[in-house]
Curated annotation (Swiss-Prot):
It comes from Gallus gallus (Chicken). This is the catalytic component of the active enzyme, which catalyzes the hydrolysis of ATP coupled with the exchange of sodium and potassium ions across the plasma membrane. This action creates the electrochemical gradient of sodium and potassium ions, providing the energy for active transport of various nutrients. Residues 1-31, 207-228 are annotated as: Disordered. Residues 209-224 have a biased composition (Polar residues). The gene is ATP1A2. The lineage of its organism: Eukaryota, Metazoa, Chordata, Craniata, Vertebrata. This is Sodium/potassium-transporting ATPase subunit alpha-2.
Length: 1017
């Protein structure tokens, strides 16, 4: 089977259900491991299978035929959402729906009034227009924000068309890589991207970098031999979009485009269904709550008004009025702006968020599955340890060269550094003299580059060393003899040569009979061999890649200058050499990672490492960064300590666990769940991309909110499936950036922790904003309710309500997004999405039932004071509504017998509206200050939030402007107030402040008590 059976384009089924089943089946197919057997075929069988001459390539006619049949060699781009759909989602998604319903109801009410009355009031018409405008403006704003992020995304895409060198009809030609077909004979050399999946038929020192596919940072050798059953591990297959690092190779293309291994991963990623974000679910829950309250109030008063004798049509208008009054017009804009501010703050801290809702998702994350290479580590091999003079020395692996130093005076070190510098083909790329050595780019294999940098740092210019000891001959590294050897002219001896050699330590040692100690050659005895073995095991156990080094001074009488050394028919000694030492390399952890992992742990977030690398290396790095914390053991550790076989250890005793990809392959979902449940510290090593996806799904089954980090194409399915996918901005592949929700611009795991902190903070602050905004709903609704029940003149008009919701309340509500955290938010457990809601019943009861009621009292007090000053005592107001609103009544008497015309009555009524509005502003001062904290006293929190202080001043200034600005009486029916009327609501404002401070004091004194259960939101 050549992987062509399931092409992602094959979904054509008549009915939707069948199509869904088909899609699920395909995804399951894609989740399976790669299945191909071309690596097992002999070259003749290969030629027959693909009808190709292995030396001359395809004929042009045959190539054109295959191209027409298979289509171009390119990945199908993931289905993109058209811009108009994105825009409509912003206009009609989530919260906006509530406002649209409100607007439609307003137009409906206006229509009813227009049909019934001769001169209908235009309030409902204004209200409908304003609601629609709010949704449209906010929608445009959110759309613009997301479009900006996706613009940054598009700039990541590399637009350079890739070229490939193919041999057709015996001639080498450069063609566009899209035109490569199955069966083509392709040649790749160091620096090229592999244009398609191909089976190698001949190679010369070829190495490829498979890290984007498997996550292994070491370059892999490629040769025609079939070395492994698994096609991903065998040496004779090269994969599409991996890079050839050095050497050359020829191969036959076995699959192109979406049928390549890389293509299957990309289709797997684009085919996954993405769940809703936690914040979207929260907003839905909130809308359900608010709608519930609104409909309940509306229907209650609808029935009540019918009982009180109103007509059906009047009752319907009341019903609509109450429902609309419950809609918090300003909240949609507030939430959008708060999320945008956080997204901007995160971008400054190197987290680019692609969609606003992901901002909060990161805060509710409870599990992070992190890739190792490049995310937790620096993604550059570095020399970590040396063993010479029978001692292990530590090298410096820090990013800024501030780490350990060792004694460089030993003559043995001089010999070791000379071998590492000479027997080494890596060079620095030109023009980097001003860059620090550790950051320079090199040409060559990762291990050799590490040696080059190490020697350059400790011994000065390697280039000078090589110029003084010119190379005469060399045997490059190959997988059969596992060493690399070169012979150089010695600078200190005008006649002599030195032979230097490095390679796998055990292979080097068996060629040596002597060892260099303190600069003296001594015979290599059993004791030294044991010391070597111990050092080798210790360094290998640290997950490091160990190389051995030896040399031999060639006798000048046998090998004078000008001697013809022959590397093929070896005419010089390659045994009886002198062993000098070991050097070991590792891709070291990034400096900020251990601290970040510690913060995650105290924040209750489980960090799981998922990598394609070796278990030993993975475990060493996991211990280095604290994913496996000190003192925690795996089953293997316990077995080694107690000296018993692994099978006798109870796996539950081990807190840590390293799972090998091959074991994961045979596990059932239940066994995986068992591991995820029972171990707190988990490392998955040697995993394939499909397994990454299975691990993420496993975590989600446990009810976790999962964040996944990754940079390779292999990570994209997991990135897409996770609740929040985090891609790397520098090292990340385009496919992974496409699949992710967030991009770390500096590739640093530590940035995720700041992201989590911002996400948690915005969740807390959104609660505060919502509590603040909802509270003023009660003083806005109650006037209308009393107007219906007690038949009093309307205390607060529609226009004034809009001035509060879209005017005075906006800036203060947004200013709460800038509020600092109350306690250390990184010390608490992640929120449980099932129980810990953004808006819960307790928040509604606090805002509506307690604080809102006090605010309404303040407003009514002011209303009654003004009417009483004008001669209407409260008792006279009951039942006066019909006469009050009747245009033909111009002789309405007040409590003192004075007669009022319709116009005069209305001026007093509108003055009352203005004063009620001013009272709400005054009580909202206190509300804003108490909403700063949910548990602490305001005196503990302080007033450091400058934006909030500005918000207080701004709402007061706006209220004064609306009241005193000339012309407002005509435009908004707002009238100037006497100064004393502003003070009517002050006592209520103080009452709110005192009430809430006492409540919070009880909260802190009796945590978990009755008050907390009933009022802590």
């Amino acid at each position: 089977m050549d992987g062509r059976e399931y092409s992602p384009a094959a979904t054509t089924s008549e009915n939707g259900g069948g199509r869904r089943k088909q899609k699920e089946k395909e995804l399951d197919e894609l989740k399976k491991e790669v299945n191909l057997d071309d690596h097992k075929l002999s070259l003749d069988e290969l030629g027959r299978k693909y009808q190709v001459d292995l030396s001359r390539g395809l004929s042009n006619a045959r190539a054109a035929e295959v191209l027409a049949q298979d289509g171009p060699n390119a990945l199908t781009p993931p289905p993109t959402t058209p811009e108009w759909v994105k825009f409509c989602r912003q206009l009609f998604g989530g919260f906006s729906i509530l406002l649209w319903i409100g607007a439609i109801l307003c137009f409906l009410a206006y229509g009813i009034q227009a049909a019934m009355e001769d001169e209908p009031s235009n309030d409902n018409l204004y209200l409908g227009v304003v609601l629609a405008a709010v949704v449209i403006v906010t929608g445009c704003f959110s759309y613009y924000q997301e479009a900006k992020s996706s613009k940054i995304m598009d700039s990541f895409k590399n637009m350079v068309p890739q070229q490939a060198l193919v041999i057709r009809e015996g001639e080498k030609i450069q063609i566009n890589a899209e035109n490569v077909v199955v069966g083509d004979l392709v040649e790749v050399k160091g620096g090229d991207r592999v244009p398609a999946d191909m089976r190698i038929i001949s190679s010369h020192g070829c190495k490829v970098d498979n890290s984007s596919l498997t996550g292994e940072s070491e370059p892999q050798t490629r040769s025609p031999e079939f070395t492994h059953e698994n096609p991903l591990e065998t040496r004779n297959i090269c994969f599409f979009s991996t890079n050839c690092v050095e050497g050359t190779a020829r191969g036959i293309v076995i699959s192109t485009g979406d049928r390549t291994v890389m293509g299957r991963i990309a289709s797997l990623a684009s085919g996954l269904e993405v769940g809703r974000t936690p914040i979207a679910m929260e907003i839905e829950h909130f809308i359900r709550l608010i709608t519930g309250v609104a409909v309940f109030l509306g229907l209650s008063f609808f029935i009540l008004s019918l009982i009180l004798g109103y007509t059906w049509l009047e009752a319907v208008i009341f019903l609509i009025g109450i429902i609309v009054a419950n809609v918090p017009e300003g909240l949609l804009a507030t939430v959008t702006v708060c999320l945008t501010l956080t997204a901007k703050r995160m971008a400054r801290k190197n987290c680019l968020v692609k969609n606003l809702e992901a901002v909060e998702t990161l805060g509710s994350t409870s599990t992070i599955c992190s890739d190792k290479t490049g995310t937790l580590t620096q993604n550059r091999m570095t020399v970590a340890h040396m063993w010479f003079d029978n001692q292990i020395h530590e090298a410096d692996t820090t990013e800024d060269q501030s780490g350990a130093t060792f004694d460089k005076r030993s003559p043995t070190w001089a010999a070791l550094s000379r071998i590492a510098g000479l027997c080494n083909r890596a060079v620095f790329k030109p023009g980097q003299e001003n860059i620090s050595i550790s950051k320079r780019d090199t040409a060559g294999d990762a291990s050799e580059s590490a040696l080059l940098k190490c020697i350059q740092l400790s011994c000065g210019s390697v280039k000078k060393m090589r110029d003084k000891n010119p190379k005469v001959t060399e045997i490059p590294f190959n997988s059969t003899n596992k060493y690399q050897l070169s012979i150089h002219e010695r600078e200190e001896d005008p006649q002599g040569h030195i032979l230097v050699m490095k390679g796998a330590p055990e292979r080097i040692l068996e060629r040596c009979s002597r060892i260099l100690l303190q600069g003296q050659e001594v015979p290599l005895d059993e004791e030294m061999k044991e010391a070597f073995q111990n050092a080798y095991l210790e360094l290998g156990g640290l997950g490091e890649r160990v190389l051995g080094f030896c040399h031999l001074y060639l006798p000048p009488d046998k090998f004078p200058r000008g001697f013809r050394f022959d590397a093929d028919e070896v005419n010089f000694p390659t045994s009886d050499l002198c062993f000098v030492g070991l050097m070991s390399m590792i891709d070291p952890p990034r400096a900020a990672v251990p601290d970040a992992v510690g913060k995650c742990r105290s924040a209750g977030i489980k960090v799981i490492m998922v990598t394609g690398d070796h278990p030993i290396t993975a475990k060493a790095i996991a211990k280095g960064v604290g994913i496996i914390s000190e003192g925690n053991e795996t089953v293997e550790d316990i077995a080694a300590r107690l000296n018993i076989p692994v099978s006798q250890v109870n796996p539950r005793e081990a807190k840590a666990c390293v799972v090998h990809g091959s074991d994961l392959k045979d596990m059932t979902a239940e066994q995986l769940d068992e591991i995820l449940r029972n171990h707190t510290e988990i490392v998955f090593a040697r995993t394939s991309p499909q397994q990454k996806l299975i691990i993420v799904e496993g975590c989600q089954r446990q009810g976790a909110i999962v964040a996944v980090t990754g940079d390779g194409v292999n990570d994209s399915p997991a990135l897409k499936k996770a609740d929040i996918g985090i891609a790397m901005g520098i090292a990340g592949s385009d496919v992974s950036k496409q699949a992710a929700d967030m991009i770390l611009l500096d590739d640093n795991f530590a940035s995720i922790v700041t992201g989590v902190e911002e996400g948690r903070l915005i969740f807390d602050n959104l609660k505060k904003s919502i509590a603040y905004t909802l509270t003023s709903n009660i003083p806005e609704i109650t006037p209308f309710l009393l107007f219906i029940i007690a038949n009093i003149p309307l205390p607060l008009g529609t226009v004034t309500i809009l001035c509060i919701d879209l005017g005075t309340d906006m800036v203060p509500a947004i200013s709460l997004a800038y509020e600092a955290a109350e306690s250390d938010i990184m010390k608490r457990q992640p929120r449980n999405p099932r129980t810990d809601k953004l808006v819960n019943e307790r928040l509604i009861s606090m805002a509506y039932g307690q604080i809102g009621m006090i605010q309404a009292l303040g407003g009514f007090f002011t209303y009654f004071v003004i009417l009483a000053e004008n001669g209407f005592l409260p008792a006279r107001l009951l039942g006066v509504r019909l006469a009050w609103d009747d245009r033909s009544t111009n002789d309405l008497e007040d409590s003192y017998g004075q007669e009022w015309t319709y116009e005069q009555r209305k001026v007093v009524e509108f003055t009352c509206h203005t004063a009620f509005f001013a009272s709400i502003v005054v009580v909202q001062w206190a509300d804003l200050i108490i909403c700063k904290t949910r548990r602490n006293s305001v005196f503990q929190q302080g007033m450091k939030n400058k934006i909030l202080i500005f918000g207080l001043l701004e709402e007061t200034a706006l209220a004064a402007f609306l009241s005193y600005c000339p012309g407002m009486g005509v435009a908004l029916r707002m009238y100037p107030l006497k100064v004393t009327w502003w003070f009517c609501a002050f006592p209520y404002s103080l009452l709110i402040f005192a009430y809430d401070e006492v409540r919070k004091l009880i909260l802190r004194r009796y945590p978990g008590g009755w008050v907390e259960k009933e009022t802590y939101y």
